[in-house]
Amino acid sequence: MSKLYVFGIGGTGSRVLKSLTMLLAAGVKINVDEIVPIVIDPDHAAADLTRTVKLMQDYNKIHESIDHNNYNKNAFFGTKINLDIIPGVRMPLANTENIDFETYIGLPMMTDENGNYTPNYALSKMLFSEKNLKSTMEVGFKGNPNIGSVVLNQFVMSDEFTNFAASVGNNDRIFIISSIFGGTGASGFPLLLKNLRAIGNTKSGCENVKNAPIGAVTVLPYFDVAPDNNPDEEKRSEIDSATFISKTKAALSYYERNMNEENVLYYIGDNISKQYKNSEGGSTQKNDAHFIELAAALAIVDFTNMPDLKCKNGKPDNVTYKEFAIKQEAKEIAFSDLDGSTLAIIKKPLTTFTMFCKYMKEQLAESIHQPWAKDHKFDDNFFNSTFYKAYLTDMREAYLQWLAEMAGNVRAFRPFVLEEKKKDVFSLIVGEPPAKVLSLKSNYALFDDYLNSKQGKLKTDGKKEQLFVELFYNAIEALAQAKLRIQ
Protein backbone atom coordinates (compact mmCIF):
# COMPACT_ATOMS: atom_id res chain seq x y z
CA MET A 1 0.00 0.00 0.00
CA SER A 2 1.67 3.20 -1.16
CA LYS A 3 0.86 6.56 0.37
CA LEU A 4 1.36 10.11 -0.80
CA TYR A 5 1.66 12.65 2.00
CA VAL A 6 0.44 16.01 0.71
CA PHE A 7 1.47 19.01 2.80
CA GLY A 8 -0.69 22.05 2.10
CA ILE A 9 0.91 25.21 3.49
CA GLY A 10 -1.29 28.25 4.09
CA GLY A 11 -4.47 29.22 2.26
CA THR A 12 -3.19 28.23 -1.18
CA GLY A 13 -2.29 24.80 0.19
CA SER A 14 -5.85 24.26 1.41
CA ARG A 15 -7.37 25.41 -1.86
CA VAL A 16 -5.17 23.12 -3.96
CA LEU A 17 -6.08 20.23 -1.65
CA LYS A 18 -9.71 21.10 -2.34
CA SER A 19 -9.13 20.86 -6.09
CA LEU A 20 -7.31 17.56 -5.63
CA THR A 21 -10.29 16.20 -3.67
CA MET A 22 -12.63 17.23 -6.49
CA LEU A 23 -10.43 15.47 -9.06
CA LEU A 24 -10.39 12.29 -6.97
CA ALA A 25 -14.17 12.44 -6.50
CA ALA A 26 -14.54 12.61 -10.28
CA GLY A 27 -12.36 9.54 -10.69
CA VAL A 28 -9.05 11.02 -11.84
CA LYS A 29 -6.51 8.23 -11.51
CA ILE A 30 -3.55 8.81 -9.22
CA ASN A 31 -0.73 6.32 -8.90
CA VAL A 32 -0.92 5.75 -5.12
CA ASP A 33 -3.27 3.83 -2.86
CA GLU A 34 -3.83 6.58 -0.31
CA ILE A 35 -3.57 10.33 0.02
CA VAL A 36 -2.60 11.65 3.46
CA PRO A 37 -3.40 15.39 3.67
CA ILE A 38 -1.50 17.53 6.18
CA VAL A 39 -2.16 21.26 6.46
CA ILE A 40 0.29 23.69 8.04
CA ASP A 41 -1.50 26.96 8.73
CA PRO A 42 -1.42 29.17 11.84
CA ASP A 43 -4.80 30.62 10.82
CA HIS A 44 -7.00 28.66 13.23
CA ALA A 45 -10.27 29.91 11.73
CA ALA A 46 -9.25 29.86 8.05
CA ALA A 47 -12.42 29.52 5.98
CA ASP A 48 -10.61 27.85 3.08
CA LEU A 49 -9.16 25.25 5.45
CA THR A 50 -12.52 24.63 7.14
CA ARG A 51 -14.26 24.06 3.81
CA THR A 52 -11.52 21.75 2.57
CA VAL A 53 -11.54 19.60 5.70
CA LYS A 54 -15.35 19.26 5.53
CA LEU A 55 -15.08 18.28 1.87
CA MET A 56 -12.47 15.60 2.56
CA GLN A 57 -14.53 14.21 5.43
CA ASP A 58 -17.60 13.88 3.17
CA TYR A 59 -15.43 12.34 0.46
CA ASN A 60 -14.06 9.75 2.86
CA LYS A 61 -17.51 8.76 4.12
CA ILE A 62 -18.58 8.14 0.53
CA HIS A 63 -15.37 6.27 -0.32
CA GLU A 64 -15.81 3.99 2.69
CA SER A 65 -19.37 3.15 1.61
CA ILE A 66 -18.31 2.00 -1.86
CA ASP A 67 -16.45 -1.15 -2.87
CA HIS A 68 -13.51 -0.61 -5.19
CA ASN A 69 -12.49 -3.90 -6.75
CA ASN A 70 -11.91 -5.42 -10.16
CA TYR A 71 -15.58 -6.35 -10.58
CA ASN A 72 -16.88 -2.82 -10.09
CA LYS A 73 -16.12 -0.37 -12.89
CA ASN A 74 -16.97 2.72 -10.86
CA ALA A 75 -14.11 5.22 -10.67
CA PHE A 76 -15.86 7.90 -8.61
CA PHE A 77 -14.31 8.38 -5.15
CA GLY A 78 -11.75 5.71 -5.99
CA THR A 79 -8.74 6.80 -3.93
CA LYS A 80 -8.70 6.71 -0.15
CA ILE A 81 -8.01 9.96 1.69
CA ASN A 82 -6.47 8.90 4.99
CA LEU A 83 -7.64 11.22 7.77
CA ASP A 84 -6.45 8.99 10.62
CA ILE A 85 -2.70 9.68 10.68
CA ILE A 86 -3.22 13.41 11.27
CA PRO A 87 -6.69 13.72 12.88
CA GLY A 88 -8.23 17.02 11.90
CA VAL A 89 -5.72 17.27 9.01
CA ARG A 90 -4.00 20.31 10.51
CA MET A 91 -0.56 20.18 12.10
CA PRO A 92 -0.86 22.50 15.11
CA LEU A 93 1.44 25.40 15.85
CA ALA A 94 1.68 26.00 19.58
CA ASN A 95 1.52 29.42 21.25
CA THR A 96 0.35 31.40 18.23
CA GLU A 97 -3.10 32.42 19.50
CA ASN A 98 -3.70 35.66 21.40
CA ILE A 99 -0.04 36.59 21.34
CA ASP A 100 2.05 39.06 19.37
CA PHE A 101 5.32 38.18 17.70
CA GLU A 102 7.61 40.01 20.12
CA THR A 103 6.11 38.07 23.03
CA TYR A 104 6.42 34.83 21.06
CA ILE A 105 10.17 35.31 20.59
CA GLY A 106 10.58 36.57 24.16
CA LEU A 107 11.83 40.01 23.17
CA PRO A 108 11.02 41.68 26.53
CA MET A 109 13.01 38.95 28.30
CA MET A 110 16.20 39.55 26.30
CA THR A 111 18.02 41.25 29.17
CA ASP A 112 21.01 40.43 31.35
CA GLU A 113 21.06 40.20 35.14
CA ASN A 114 21.33 43.99 35.34
CA GLY A 115 18.26 44.55 33.20
CA ASN A 116 20.24 45.72 30.17
CA TYR A 117 19.18 44.54 26.74
CA THR A 118 21.34 41.79 25.24
CA PRO A 119 22.81 41.62 21.72
CA ASN A 120 19.93 39.27 20.81
CA TYR A 121 17.53 42.12 21.53
CA ALA A 122 19.43 44.43 19.20
CA LEU A 123 19.56 41.75 16.51
CA SER A 124 15.80 41.14 16.77
CA LYS A 125 15.07 44.86 16.51
CA MET A 126 17.25 44.98 13.41
CA LEU A 127 15.63 41.97 11.72
CA PHE A 128 12.00 42.83 12.47
CA SER A 129 10.15 46.11 12.11
CA GLU A 130 8.05 47.49 14.94
CA LYS A 131 4.95 46.47 12.98
CA ASN A 132 6.34 42.93 12.65
CA LEU A 133 6.99 42.72 16.36
CA LYS A 134 3.51 43.94 17.30
CA SER A 135 1.83 41.65 14.76
CA THR A 136 -0.50 38.94 16.04
CA MET A 137 -0.41 35.50 14.42
CA GLU A 138 -3.81 33.88 14.88
CA VAL A 139 -4.70 34.51 11.21
CA GLY A 140 -1.27 33.70 9.81
CA PHE A 141 1.76 35.79 8.98
CA LYS A 142 0.01 38.37 6.78
CA GLY A 143 2.54 38.31 4.00
CA ASN A 144 5.59 38.36 6.29
CA PRO A 145 7.80 35.33 5.56
CA ASN A 146 10.43 36.62 8.00
CA ILE A 147 7.94 36.00 10.82
CA GLY A 148 6.83 32.69 9.36
CA SER A 149 10.37 31.38 9.13
CA VAL A 150 10.71 31.72 12.91
CA VAL A 151 7.30 30.42 14.00
CA LEU A 152 6.91 27.53 11.57
CA ASN A 153 10.14 25.86 12.61
CA GLN A 154 8.40 24.48 15.70
CA PHE A 155 6.05 22.01 13.97
CA VAL A 156 8.73 19.29 13.90
CA MET A 157 8.44 19.06 17.69
CA SER A 158 4.73 18.23 17.62
CA ASP A 159 3.21 14.81 18.27
CA GLU A 160 1.55 15.05 14.86
CA PHE A 161 4.91 15.32 13.10
CA THR A 162 6.17 12.32 15.08
CA ASN A 163 3.08 10.33 14.06
CA PHE A 164 3.59 11.34 10.44
CA ALA A 165 7.23 10.22 10.42
CA ALA A 166 6.42 6.89 12.06
CA SER A 167 3.78 6.11 9.43
CA VAL A 168 5.97 6.70 6.35
CA GLY A 169 6.86 3.50 4.50
CA ASN A 170 9.71 2.88 2.08
CA ASN A 171 7.39 3.10 -0.96
CA ASP A 172 5.76 6.35 0.08
CA ARG A 173 6.20 9.81 -1.37
CA ILE A 174 5.78 13.39 -0.14
CA PHE A 175 4.40 16.44 -1.94
CA ILE A 176 4.41 20.06 -0.74
CA ILE A 177 2.00 22.81 -1.87
CA SER A 178 2.81 26.44 -1.15
CA SER A 179 2.49 29.93 -2.55
CA ILE A 180 5.55 32.07 -2.98
CA PHE A 181 4.07 35.57 -2.66
CA GLY A 182 2.69 35.60 0.89
CA GLY A 183 4.02 34.79 4.33
CA THR A 184 3.06 31.27 5.34
CA GLY A 185 3.81 29.46 2.09
CA ALA A 186 6.95 31.38 1.17
CA SER A 187 8.56 30.62 4.52
CA GLY A 188 6.98 27.23 5.14
CA PHE A 189 8.16 25.42 2.02
CA PRO A 190 11.94 25.85 2.56
CA LEU A 191 11.59 25.06 6.27
CA LEU A 192 9.51 21.95 5.73
CA LEU A 193 11.82 20.64 3.02
CA LYS A 194 14.88 21.23 5.20
CA ASN A 195 13.30 19.45 8.17
CA LEU A 196 12.20 16.48 6.09
CA ARG A 197 15.64 15.93 4.59
CA ALA A 198 17.47 16.54 7.88
CA ILE A 199 15.03 14.75 10.16
CA GLY A 200 16.55 13.60 13.44
CA ASN A 201 17.79 10.01 13.58
CA THR A 202 15.93 9.39 16.83
CA LYS A 203 12.49 9.59 15.21
CA SER A 204 10.78 6.39 14.13
CA GLY A 205 10.64 6.24 10.32
CA CYS A 206 13.36 8.85 9.93
CA GLU A 207 15.20 7.05 7.10
CA ASN A 208 12.00 6.62 5.10
CA VAL A 209 11.20 10.31 5.50
CA LYS A 210 14.73 11.48 4.71
CA ASN A 211 14.96 9.47 1.51
CA ALA A 212 11.36 9.68 0.29
CA PRO A 213 10.85 11.14 -3.19
CA ILE A 214 9.65 14.70 -2.62
CA GLY A 215 7.78 16.85 -5.12
CA ALA A 216 6.54 20.39 -4.65
CA VAL A 217 4.49 23.00 -6.46
CA THR A 218 5.21 26.62 -5.73
CA VAL A 219 2.39 28.91 -6.79
CA LEU A 220 3.31 32.33 -8.14
CA PRO A 221 0.86 35.28 -8.01
CA TYR A 222 -2.49 34.54 -9.63
CA PHE A 223 -4.82 36.97 -7.87
CA ASP A 224 -4.81 40.50 -6.42
CA VAL A 225 -6.42 41.94 -3.33
CA ALA A 226 -8.11 45.31 -3.09
CA PRO A 227 -6.05 47.99 -1.34
CA ASP A 228 -7.08 48.88 2.19
CA ASN A 229 -7.59 52.64 2.30
CA ASN A 230 -8.41 52.86 5.99
CA PRO A 231 -7.36 56.37 7.07
CA ASP A 232 -5.97 54.87 10.27
CA GLU A 233 -2.69 53.40 9.05
CA GLU A 234 -2.36 51.21 12.14
CA LYS A 235 -5.61 49.43 11.25
CA ARG A 236 -4.85 48.84 7.58
CA SER A 237 -4.50 45.30 6.33
CA GLU A 238 -0.94 44.07 6.04
CA ILE A 239 -1.83 42.23 2.82
CA ASP A 240 -0.73 44.38 -0.11
CA SER A 241 -0.76 42.84 -3.58
CA ALA A 242 1.57 45.59 -4.80
CA THR A 243 4.32 43.66 -3.01
CA PHE A 244 3.47 40.25 -4.50
CA ILE A 245 5.90 40.49 -7.42
CA SER A 246 8.83 41.81 -5.39
CA LYS A 247 8.31 39.09 -2.79
CA THR A 248 8.12 36.50 -5.55
CA LYS A 249 11.40 37.68 -7.07
CA ALA A 250 13.13 37.60 -3.70
CA ALA A 251 11.85 34.10 -2.95
CA LEU A 252 12.76 32.80 -6.41
CA SER A 253 16.27 34.13 -5.96
CA TYR A 254 16.54 32.27 -2.66
CA TYR A 255 15.10 29.08 -4.18
CA GLU A 256 17.62 29.22 -7.02
CA ARG A 257 20.54 29.38 -4.60
CA ASN A 258 19.33 27.10 -1.84
CA MET A 259 16.50 24.77 -2.92
CA ASN A 260 18.00 21.57 -4.31
CA GLU A 261 16.66 18.88 -1.99
CA GLU A 262 13.38 18.13 -3.79
CA ASN A 263 13.18 15.59 -6.62
CA VAL A 264 10.66 17.56 -8.67
CA LEU A 265 9.68 21.23 -8.43
CA TYR A 266 6.66 22.59 -10.30
CA TYR A 267 6.10 26.29 -10.96
CA ILE A 268 2.72 27.79 -11.82
CA GLY A 269 1.17 31.26 -11.87
CA ASP A 270 -0.75 33.67 -14.11
CA ASN A 271 -0.39 37.25 -15.27
CA ILE A 272 -4.16 37.73 -15.55
CA SER A 273 -5.85 38.02 -12.19
CA LYS A 274 -9.01 38.95 -10.34
CA GLN A 275 -9.07 41.35 -7.43
CA TYR A 276 -10.42 39.81 -4.23
CA LYS A 277 -11.68 41.54 -1.12
CA ASN A 278 -8.80 42.27 1.23
CA SER A 279 -8.91 39.86 4.17
CA GLU A 280 -5.96 39.02 6.38
CA GLY A 281 -7.47 35.62 7.18
CA GLY A 282 -9.94 33.90 9.46
CA SER A 283 -13.54 33.10 8.58
CA THR A 284 -13.80 36.03 6.12
CA GLN A 285 -11.10 34.75 3.77
CA LYS A 286 -13.06 32.70 1.23
CA ASN A 287 -11.35 32.89 -2.14
CA ASP A 288 -13.25 31.53 -5.12
CA ALA A 289 -11.82 28.40 -6.71
CA HIS A 290 -9.34 29.10 -9.53
CA PHE A 291 -7.98 27.15 -12.49
CA ILE A 292 -4.44 27.67 -11.18
CA GLU A 293 -5.37 25.58 -8.13
CA LEU A 294 -6.74 22.84 -10.38
CA ALA A 295 -3.54 22.88 -12.45
CA ALA A 296 -1.46 22.75 -9.25
CA ALA A 297 -3.45 19.68 -8.18
CA LEU A 298 -2.59 18.10 -11.53
CA ALA A 299 1.08 18.52 -10.60
CA ILE A 300 0.39 16.09 -7.75
CA VAL A 301 -1.09 13.58 -10.19
CA ASP A 302 1.90 14.01 -12.50
CA PHE A 303 4.35 13.50 -9.63
CA THR A 304 2.83 10.12 -8.70
CA ASN A 305 3.35 8.92 -12.27
CA MET A 306 7.05 9.79 -12.41
CA PRO A 307 9.16 6.62 -12.09
CA ASP A 308 12.63 6.14 -10.63
CA LEU A 309 12.73 9.11 -8.28
CA LYS A 310 15.60 8.30 -5.96
CA CYS A 311 17.21 9.91 -2.95
CA LYS A 312 20.24 8.87 -0.91
CA ASN A 313 21.24 10.31 2.46
CA GLY A 314 18.67 13.06 2.01
CA LYS A 315 19.97 14.12 -1.41
CA PRO A 316 18.02 13.46 -4.64
CA ASP A 317 19.90 12.04 -7.61
CA ASN A 318 18.78 15.03 -9.64
CA VAL A 319 16.18 17.81 -9.54
CA THR A 320 13.56 18.12 -12.29
CA TYR A 321 11.77 21.43 -12.91
CA LYS A 322 8.35 21.58 -14.56
CA GLU A 323 5.83 24.22 -15.62
CA PHE A 324 2.21 24.09 -16.79
CA ALA A 325 0.83 25.73 -19.92
CA ILE A 326 -2.40 25.84 -21.87
CA LYS A 327 -2.40 25.11 -25.59
CA GLN A 328 -3.53 28.57 -26.64
CA GLU A 329 -4.09 31.93 -24.98
CA ALA A 330 -7.66 32.27 -23.70
CA LYS A 331 -9.25 34.41 -21.00
CA GLU A 332 -11.97 31.77 -20.70
CA ILE A 333 -10.45 28.29 -20.86
CA ALA A 334 -12.44 25.41 -22.33
CA PHE A 335 -11.35 21.83 -22.92
CA SER A 336 -10.28 22.80 -26.45
CA ASP A 337 -7.64 25.13 -24.98
CA LEU A 338 -5.91 22.36 -23.02
CA ASP A 339 -3.09 20.13 -24.16
CA GLY A 340 -3.90 16.53 -25.06
CA SER A 341 -1.99 15.13 -22.09
CA THR A 342 -4.10 17.23 -19.69
CA LEU A 343 -7.33 16.26 -21.46
CA ALA A 344 -6.42 12.58 -21.14
CA ILE A 345 -6.34 13.01 -17.37
CA ILE A 346 -9.37 15.19 -16.65
CA LYS A 347 -11.87 15.36 -19.53
CA LYS A 348 -13.67 12.05 -19.00
CA PRO A 349 -13.68 12.17 -15.17
CA LEU A 350 -14.88 15.78 -14.94
CA THR A 351 -17.51 15.28 -17.64
CA THR A 352 -18.98 12.09 -16.20
CA PHE A 353 -19.01 13.42 -12.63
CA THR A 354 -20.62 16.67 -13.78
CA MET A 355 -23.35 14.63 -15.50
CA PHE A 356 -23.84 12.66 -12.27
CA CYS A 357 -24.12 15.80 -10.12
CA LYS A 358 -26.41 17.66 -12.52
CA TYR A 359 -28.76 14.66 -12.78
CA MET A 360 -29.00 14.39 -9.00
CA LYS A 361 -29.69 18.12 -8.69
CA GLU A 362 -32.00 18.63 -11.68
CA GLN A 363 -33.78 15.36 -12.39
CA LEU A 364 -33.57 12.68 -9.72
CA ALA A 365 -36.72 13.72 -7.83
CA GLU A 366 -38.75 13.25 -11.04
CA SER A 367 -37.29 9.82 -11.83
CA ILE A 368 -37.58 7.88 -8.57
CA HIS A 369 -40.43 5.80 -10.05
CA GLN A 370 -38.28 4.60 -12.95
CA PRO A 371 -37.40 0.87 -13.06
CA TRP A 372 -33.77 1.62 -12.15
CA ALA A 373 -34.96 3.09 -8.83
CA LYS A 374 -37.86 0.74 -8.03
CA ASP A 375 -36.06 -2.52 -8.85
CA HIS A 376 -33.23 -1.75 -6.42
CA LYS A 377 -35.44 -0.05 -3.82
CA PHE A 378 -33.83 3.33 -4.13
CA ASP A 379 -36.71 4.79 -2.15
CA ASP A 380 -37.36 7.50 0.41
CA ASN A 381 -35.38 5.59 3.02
CA PHE A 382 -32.32 5.62 0.77
CA PHE A 383 -32.67 9.24 -0.34
CA ASN A 384 -33.15 10.35 3.26
CA SER A 385 -30.15 8.35 4.47
CA THR A 386 -27.06 10.09 5.79
CA PHE A 387 -25.07 8.74 2.85
CA TYR A 388 -27.26 10.43 0.25
CA LYS A 389 -28.81 13.40 2.03
CA ALA A 390 -25.67 14.53 3.83
CA TYR A 391 -22.46 13.23 2.29
CA LEU A 392 -23.37 12.80 -1.39
CA THR A 393 -25.63 15.86 -1.56
CA ASP A 394 -23.04 18.07 0.14
CA MET A 395 -20.35 16.76 -2.21
CA ARG A 396 -22.61 17.43 -5.21
CA GLU A 397 -23.25 21.01 -4.16
CA ALA A 398 -19.59 21.65 -3.35
CA TYR A 399 -18.48 20.26 -6.71
CA LEU A 400 -20.95 22.29 -8.77
CA GLN A 401 -20.06 25.39 -6.77
CA TRP A 402 -16.36 24.69 -7.41
CA LEU A 403 -17.00 24.57 -11.16
CA ALA A 404 -19.11 27.73 -11.00
CA GLU A 405 -16.42 29.62 -9.08
CA MET A 406 -13.74 28.66 -11.61
CA ALA A 407 -16.06 29.69 -14.46
CA GLY A 408 -16.56 33.10 -12.85
CA ASN A 409 -12.92 33.74 -11.99
CA VAL A 410 -10.15 35.45 -13.95
CA ARG A 411 -8.72 33.64 -15.83
CA ALA A 412 -11.91 31.58 -16.15
CA PHE A 413 -12.10 27.82 -16.58
CA ARG A 414 -15.48 27.08 -18.16
CA PRO A 415 -15.55 23.65 -19.81
CA PHE A 416 -19.25 23.06 -19.07
CA VAL A 417 -22.61 24.76 -19.48
CA LEU A 418 -23.71 24.63 -15.85
CA GLU A 419 -27.10 26.30 -16.25
CA GLU A 420 -30.10 23.97 -16.06
CA LYS A 421 -31.31 23.16 -19.58
CA LYS A 422 -33.67 20.21 -19.42
CA LYS A 423 -34.51 20.54 -23.11
CA ASP A 424 -30.85 20.51 -24.12
CA VAL A 425 -29.17 18.35 -21.47
CA PHE A 426 -26.31 17.07 -23.59
CA SER A 427 -25.12 20.45 -24.86
CA LEU A 428 -22.90 20.21 -21.81
CA ILE A 429 -19.35 20.66 -23.06
CA VAL A 430 -18.60 24.19 -24.23
CA GLY A 431 -17.87 24.26 -27.96
CA GLU A 432 -18.72 20.59 -28.52
CA PRO A 433 -22.25 19.89 -29.81
CA PRO A 434 -23.65 16.49 -28.80
CA ALA A 435 -23.87 13.57 -31.20
CA LYS A 436 -27.16 12.12 -32.42
CA VAL A 437 -28.16 8.62 -31.31
CA LEU A 438 -30.78 6.19 -32.59
CA SER A 439 -33.44 6.66 -29.96
CA LEU A 440 -36.92 8.13 -29.69
CA LYS A 441 -35.94 9.55 -26.32
CA SER A 442 -33.86 12.60 -25.54
CA ASN A 443 -32.46 14.63 -22.66
CA TYR A 444 -33.19 13.20 -19.21
CA ALA A 445 -35.60 10.62 -20.66
CA LEU A 446 -32.64 9.21 -22.58
CA PHE A 447 -30.55 9.39 -19.39
CA ASP A 448 -33.19 7.30 -17.59
CA ASP A 449 -33.25 4.88 -20.50
CA TYR A 450 -29.52 4.24 -20.08
CA LEU A 451 -29.96 3.81 -16.32
CA ASN A 452 -32.75 1.29 -16.91
CA SER A 453 -30.68 -0.63 -19.44
CA LYS A 454 -27.72 -0.91 -17.05
CA GLN A 455 -29.58 -1.68 -13.82
CA GLY A 456 -30.22 -5.34 -14.68
CA LYS A 457 -26.48 -6.03 -14.79
CA LEU A 458 -25.83 -4.94 -11.21
CA LYS A 459 -25.09 -7.47 -8.50
CA THR A 460 -28.13 -7.57 -6.25
CA ASP A 461 -26.31 -8.54 -3.06
CA GLY A 462 -24.26 -5.35 -2.72
CA LYS A 463 -24.82 -2.37 -0.45
CA LYS A 464 -27.31 0.16 -1.76
CA GLU A 465 -24.69 2.90 -1.66
CA GLN A 466 -22.44 0.77 -3.84
CA LEU A 467 -25.24 -0.15 -6.26
CA PHE A 468 -26.35 3.46 -6.64
CA VAL A 469 -22.95 4.89 -7.52
CA GLU A 470 -22.02 1.88 -9.67
CA LEU A 471 -25.26 2.12 -11.65
CA PHE A 472 -24.80 5.79 -12.39
CA TYR A 473 -21.15 5.38 -13.32
CA ASN A 474 -21.92 2.57 -15.79
CA ALA A 475 -24.85 4.41 -17.37
CA ILE A 476 -23.05 7.76 -17.58
CA GLU A 477 -19.92 6.20 -19.06
CA ALA A 478 -21.97 4.66 -21.89
CA LEU A 479 -24.04 7.81 -22.34
CA ALA A 480 -20.99 10.09 -22.45
CA GLN A 481 -19.44 7.87 -25.09
CA ALA A 482 -22.59 7.91 -27.24
CA LYS A 483 -23.67 11.54 -26.88
CA LEU A 484 -20.47 13.40 -26.01
CA ARG A 485 -17.87 11.23 -27.78
CA ILE A 486 -16.01 10.71 -24.50
CA GLN A 487 -13.90 7.57 -24.74
Residue ranges and their predicted role:
Residues T21, G185-R197:
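Short Gly/Thr/Asp-enriched flexible loops that form oxyanion-binding sites at enzyme active sites
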Residues M1-A25, K29-D172, I180, N201-Q487:
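Terminal, contiguous helix-loop blocks that mediate binding/assembly
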